[in-house]
Amino acid sequence: MAKESIQAIKEALLTVTDATDERLASWREDERSGVQQAIKQWERRQLAKEKEWQLFKEMSQFEEAAYKKGHRLIAGIDEVGRGPLAGPVVTAAVILPKDCQLLGLNDSKKLSAKKRETLYNQIQEQAVAIGLGIADQGVIDQINIYQATKQAMKMAIDDLAFTPDYLLIDAMQLDVPQPQESLIKGDARSISIAAASIIAKVTRDRLMEEYDELYPGYGFKNNAGYGTKEHLLGLEKYGVTPIHRRTFAPIKDMI
């Protein structure tokens, strides 16, 4: 009887989810290096999935605690863009379903752009509700970045299709009627806040890509408005744009 081709085994391994699968024992006895390499790749994938599951469970603890208290619509809230010299601060509020199984959720800054996009789409498909809040540079200059962030977070809550009955917020306290919990580094500790972080990050990055076309020469699509060398050189060469924050150094010294 002819042996299975290496390609056939590779494809079959993509369907194997259990280490007790009898086929694994058979393939492990196959002396072909291509088969052994494929098994090692499968083992690495399994280990990565196990780590993702463990992280997911750890990051679900705050949601589980809120469910046990009787809450049902738990919103995670986060912001992106407090530090840049240009562009808005973007906030998101996300209510995930109780049986959510979005593996890979983490602080958006720890994820690759490709992974963020994948998770962004999955969150859009699975979330109970998503709300966005945006405070532009005019608001930031008028009331300061801290207050602008709070204002944008409230906007994100109001933008939700359903009113949440509990809030998990990344390092912020809000003057709202719902009970809330402020978590330092919450985007790496709560699946709901992590989801909000990803929605806010992808939304803001897309906005900055549009601004890059509108105001070329500052590298907005690469630096998202942060004060990189390319951005600072652009300021020296082309001056201040309408999306720059005039109360932030060095812009305030240039006008």
Swiss-Prot record:
Enzyme Commission code: 3.1.26.4
Residues holding a divalent metal cation: D78, E79, D170
Domain of life: Bacteria
UniProt subcellular location: Cytoplasm
Named cofactor requirement(s): Mn(2+); Mg(2+)
Keywords from the UniProt entry: Cytoplasm, Endonuclease, Hydrolase, Manganese, Metal-binding, Nuclease
Cofactor annotation remark: Manganese or magnesium. Binds 1 divalent metal ion per monomer in the absence of substrate. May bind a second metal ion after substrate binding.
Annotated GO MF terms: manganese ion binding; RNA binding; RNA-DNA hybrid ribonuclease activity
Database matches in InterPro entries: RNase_HII, RNase_HII/HIII, RNase_HII/HIII_dom, RNaseH-like_sf, RNaseH_sf
Oxidoreductase keyword on record: no
Domain RNase H type-2 per the UniProt entry, residue ranges: 72-255
UniProt xrefs under Pfam families: RNase_HII
UniProt protein name: Ribonuclease HII
Organism annotation: Enterococcus faecalis (strain ATCC 700802 / V583)
